[in-house]
């Protein structure tokens, strides 16, 4: 169980200024949270496989397919620089890297 002195110490470490009423309130709330965690700790999970998610997640991305765009020239013409059918952008990496 957590007491008001521990709440006061943690508040000081976190640079929080709590009133005595807030310290009492947080002591009660944190005590309830810790009691609940203790109940969870008592559960038998020996037959439960470790997981990072409660439900399975599958990859829902679509295939990367080429989709022609009718106004390609207008997009290329709006670029500051182009080289053939491509945008020309400034080099950002050194050749040493």
Swiss-Prot record:
Q: What is its EC number?
A: 6.3.5.-
Give the catalytic activity.
L-glutamyl-tRNA(Gln) + L-glutamine + ATP + H2O = L-glutaminyl-tRNA(Gln) + L-glutamate + ADP + phosphate + H(+); L-aspartyl-tRNA(Asn) + L-glutamine + ATP + H2O = L-asparaginyl-tRNA(Asn) + L-glutamate + ADP + phosphate + 2 H(+)
**Which top-level group of life is the source organism from?**
Bacteria
User: What's a Gene Ontology MF term here?
Assistant: ATP binding
| One Pfam entry name | GatC
Q: Which GO terms describe its biological process?
A: glutaminyl-tRNAGln biosynthesis via transamidation; regulation of translational fidelity; translation
Q: Which keywords belong to this entry?
A: ATP-binding, Ligase, Nucleotide-binding, Protein biosynthesis
- Tell whether Glycoprotein is among the UniProt keywords: no
UniProt-listed InterPro entries: Asp/Glu-ADT_sf_sub_c (IPR036113), GatC (IPR003837)
- Which segments does the entry list as coiled coil? none
Reported function: Allows the formation of correctly charged Asn-tRNA(Asn) or Gln-tRNA(Gln) through the transamidation of misacylated Asp-tRNA(Asn) or Glu-tRNA(Gln) in organisms which lack either or both of asparaginyl-tRNA or glutaminyl-tRNA synthetases. The reaction takes place in the presence of glutamine and ATP through an activated phospho-Asp-tRNA(Asn) or phospho-Glu-tRNA(Gln).
Q: How does it assemble?
A: Heterotrimer of A, B and C subunits.
Q: Which HAMAP family match?
A: GatC
Annotated family? Belongs to the GatC family.
Instruction: State the protein's name.
Output: Aspartyl/glutamyl-tRNA(Asn/Gln) amidotransferase subunit C
Q: Which organism is it from?
A: Nostoc punctiforme (strain ATCC 29133 / PCC 73102)
Lineage summary? Bacteria, Bacillati, Cyanobacteriota, Cyanophyceae, Nostocales
Q: What gene is this protein a product of?
A: gatC
């Amino acid at each position: 169980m957590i007491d008001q002195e521990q709440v006061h110490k943690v508040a000081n470490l976190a640079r929080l200024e709590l009133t005595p009423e807030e310290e009492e309130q947080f002591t009660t709330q944190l005590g309830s949270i810790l009691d609940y965690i203790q109940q969870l700790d008592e559960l038998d999970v020996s037959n439960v496989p470790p997981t990072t998610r409660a439900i399975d997640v599958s990859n829902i991305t679509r295939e990367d397919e080429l989709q022609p765009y009718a106004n390609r020239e207008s997009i290329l013409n709006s670029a500051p620089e182009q080289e053939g059918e491509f945008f020309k952008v400034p080099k950002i990496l050194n050749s040493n890297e």
